[in-house]
């Protein structure tokens, strides 16, 4: 009898645990499984590891798997370690552009630090003002797609004017792909703005906002 992919995974995990190893290496353990089976296998793995006292090293390109399973995270870029530390801390404060990309950030701009509290996001064509003191080591700014605040009417501080390039409607969200614009010229850089289903009706009633606002608390200042 040929075992299914899920059954093969269960047998392999059971054999590993039977040896009571000091270290377990899991290399993309769920990559070949469909979404439904993957969720069940992850639950089973968590249960199997509850009483395991050794170290588990998981290699994965899935940020959801890493966030769910790991307490500590190490990021390798082109053979070099760029970040290491507490997983949730790195997700919240990625420090480097590579880490921000791997933790799901989609929007980046090169920056010029103008003074201790002002920077120019050159790819977006805007100047941002912040209360915190900026370091000269900052080379990029990142902003997660779901954290933009839509603004209708009068422009506020740290807002991007934009025009719609395209959009994609998914089951629980809509992705708007927009191009920043200034009075002088249009930028070619595409920004992703993610809108959850709960906010769809507002946009359908009011139309697209005039601006997207960036809040300082959500800005990622990156090396």
PLM-predicted stretches and their roles:
Residues 17, 49, 67, 81-91, ...:
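A generic structural signal for ordered secondary structure
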Residues 106, 117-223:
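Non-catalytic connector elements of ABC transporters
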Residues 1-98:
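ABC ATPase nucleotide-binding domains
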